Amino acid sequence: IGTSPIFMRFAETTPTSTAFWRIALAIPLLILWQMYDLKKNKGQVFVFKNIKDFQPFLLVGFFFAADLIMWHWAVNLTTVANATLLANMSVIFTAVGGFLFFGDRFSKTFIIGLTLALLGAVSLMGHSIEFNPENIFGDLLGLTAAIAYAGYMIASVAARKKFSTASVMLGTAIISAIFIFPVAIFETGLFIPSTLIEWWPLIGLAWFTHVVGQSLIVYALAHLPAALGAVGLLIQPVVAGGFAWYLFAEAL
């Protein structure tokens, strides 16, 4: 998922339209995956015994939609490094949420490791991190996206307790698209690409970043505490910063 801000920079659609297409173009592949999952494992999708079974899906979809909207705008209003690093502060909010909602306990080793990981991510980004007053709104959006992503991680853990990775990914995509679509229409109208040059960054976002990258995250959340999974995502700003340095000549 470290490639996400790179594809977004290449996208010629508006930020929210980019977020919508990231989800919409992923849905066909996720449907195929769900069909395969049902056939192979005889699992079930969207079979809710009560409203409580539906709540995690609704929360996952809402938080992911909020994260995508704010994150896509942040990348366009500040540097790739700033947006990525601030968004990955979600690890802190995820740890707090894990403690409050799941009773997760963290050892001194984990806390020290988390601190070192955060400091390491900041130091590896080096001078690419810029605190420019002109970018303050974009920086705030990046931080707000971190809070939304923490909500997504915590809700995903709850959803994965009952449903497969394929089911959570498909359910999240459908609900997120429902939330994002009216926002895109309200802003500037949904931008529909007309050339391959306009389509390829969106396809990359949908198929590589979302279907592959996001699915691996959701899969891992069934086997790891939310906070520990979030710590692993701190490699994302390093990857994004490296690509931004190479492709966009952003300082590193």
Give, region by region, the residue ranges found by the protein language model.
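Glycine-/small-residue-enriched transmembrane alpha-helix faces in small-molecule transporters
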Residues: 1-21, 30-33, 59-62, 70, ...
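C-terminal-most transmembrane helix of multi-pass membrane proteins
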Residues: 23, 34, 38, 127, ...
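Specific alpha-helical transmembrane segments that line the substrate/conduction pathway
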Residues: 17-28, 72-103, 145, 226-245
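Helix-helix packing/entry segments at the starts of transmembrane helices
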Residues: 83-89, 156-177, 210-246
